[in-house]
Every structure is written in C-alpha cells, then in structure tokens.
C-alpha cells in the first residue's frame, strides 16, 4: 500500500538519520512545502509566501522575542499557518506549546490566527484550534488554496443543525435521522461517521442530502464520493446531477479540465488510488465512501489516511457482520455505527418488501435425460446439432454431476 509504505519508510528513516533542526527544515520540510506549491527559498531567506525564522513578540524569553520556523502567508499579508520544527529524533509534540505561543503572537500582531502545524520532519500535526479541533496527525501540509478555505470557514460556517435538510432528496424519517446524527457528530468535533442502511433504503440519497447540507452550511467546499464499481459511479453521477447544481467531475469519464472547478468528485476506489497524490491532503472537506467493508479497508485504506477530511462510510452490511477494522476506520466503536437502519426495520415500516426465495429447476435436472422421453421438437433440435438422441441416457445424478461440478461452482462463487 503506497501511503503506508511511504509512512513506514519515513519512520524507518527517522531511526537511521538524526537530522538537527536546521537539517530537518532544509531536507524535509522545505521539500514537502514545495511539493504543495509553496514558494520556498533554497536557503534561509524568505519569500512573499514563506517566511523563515520570522520574529515575533510576546514570547517567554529574556528579550520577549522569538522566531517562528515558518510562517505561510496569504496574498493579503495575513498569516495562514505557522510551522514549528523539531529535530527528527525528537517527539513532534515537543513543539506543540511553542507553536501555540507563536500563533498567539501572530494573531496579536495581524488580527488573524494562523493554523498551527508542528513536526519533526517525519510526523506532521495540524492544530486548527480556532475551530475547536484537537491536534491530529496528518500525512502532509495543506496547499495555499486549502489553507485559505480553512481560514474562511471561521467566518462562513453555520450551525449544521439549523441548516435545513433537503427533504426532496432524503425526506424519509430514517434518512433525516441518519443525516442529523452525522451532523451532530461533526458538530461535536468528531471527524468520522459510519452509516448502516439496508440495500434499497436510499444510501445515495442520504449522501447527496448530507453533501448539500455541508455545502450550504459552509462546512465543505469540495466533496469526494467513492464507490467500488463503474456502474455505481454512473448511478451516483446521475443522482448528484439530478439533485444538485454543483460543478461535478466524474473521474475516468469527465474531461480533465473540469476537475479543478468541481465541487463534487465521483470516483471508483481503483480509479482514485492510482493518482490521489495529485491532490493535497486538505483538498477535500468531506469524503463519502460507499460500500464500506473489510475489503475496502484492506485495499484502499490509504485514501482515508492520506486525505485530512470529514469522512463518512456507507454500508448495507448488517451491524453484527461489520469488521472491527471498518468500525475503526470510521471512528466508531465495534458494532456501534453512527446510524443504523436494518432490513428488518425497513420491512416492518414498509419501506422495503420482504423477499421470497424461489427455487427453480428443470425437467432434465429432476428426471434425467432419456431418449424415449424426448419430445419430437427436442429430438429434431438434437439432430440439427449432429447429436444422436438414442445415445442419451442419463439419470438425474449424472446430469447434476456434469453440470454442477466443482469447477462450475467455483466460477459462480
């Protein structure tokens, strides 16, 4: 798995190389910032976008001054982020309080609180304390565009629970309850949720209504919808087009030039895994993962580790059959999803009809094949195919063995 290999490799490098703070900045942090489009000077100089060793006041030093390792600037001269670096062998968390002091100083001097990053070059933490989030480990740095939106959210975010649900899209009681539970969880500063809904009860509709609510409330600018097959990708694309007016990009189908303007991206897991690193870690604000089960975790779990977004898993797998890994991936205790609407309840409330198992067989499977019992039409058909009907004399067990052999069963399974 690519993301896991990268993380494992960097952590193994940590044990092999002991870079001091200056080397950590030059060899690791500078390179990662450049990869996200930041204009970083090759030496210790500063650029309009990235200041190094930026002096601030109000520090607990004899002079009252301190130097921020990095400050990332917006076009308006306001700080978007501050980065505190430690040498590679130190715990990244050792820089947490120092980073906060620098953020306090920048807020006091500019009127805008920057997003906080602290790192040892290998482990990177983001701390968006202005929005009430606790620090969390992330895979890389945000691009300028993603940081700008993170800052903007402080002004435009509305209360999710007071933002109406589009009941034309998801108006059934259990659908609205699922959306409300997710939004309550997000409002409580959790970043992941898992919905269990029986097949046919409208998981895609819940996804669309949830996406619209987060877009309307300023909680999301760009949304990624993941599914496991091209047929589902097409269905989801049609459904989003029908119920939203947002610019849509269907990965593997839409023209590539539409990708940069899209607010909703729909992709299969295999399609997204090929080139997800084209996006920075903060590009998407919400990821909705359809058909979330163990195989998705095993094959595509890196997508959820790479992107620093709110994440919602959707599955029709009954609660008692959901794996621990799936529950953990979406931040839920084992067998305790955020919302659950099982098949039995859907049938009881007449939102689904009970299924019936119908067993079909054929005369040949029941009675075998005997020339004396063939119709004139069957005899004529066999003769047209060059088969002598008189050679056919098989009992039911022989027919079953010939048709339902082990290889056939394996192919069906």
Label every model-predicted segment.
Residues 1-222, 227, 231-246, 260-264, ...:
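ATP-dependent helicase/translocase motor core
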Residues 249-259:
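Short acidic low-complexity segments
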Residues 88-90, 122-125, 230-232, 270-273, ...:
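Conserved nucleotide-binding/hydrolysis micro-motifs of P-loop NTPases
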Residues 92-100, 266, 286, 294-297, ...:
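Amphipathic alpha-helical transducer elements in NTP-driven molecular machines
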Residues 78-80, 110-114, 219-221, 283-284, ...:
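Short glycine-/polar-rich loops that comprise or flank the Walker A/P-loop
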Residues 279-313, 317-318:
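SF2 helicase catalytic motif II
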Residues 235, 274-275, 299, 322:
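Phosphate- and divalent-cation-binding pockets in alpha/beta enzyme and binding domains
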Residues 324-413:
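Interdomain helical connector at the RecA1-RecA2 junction of SF1/SF2 helicase-like NTPases
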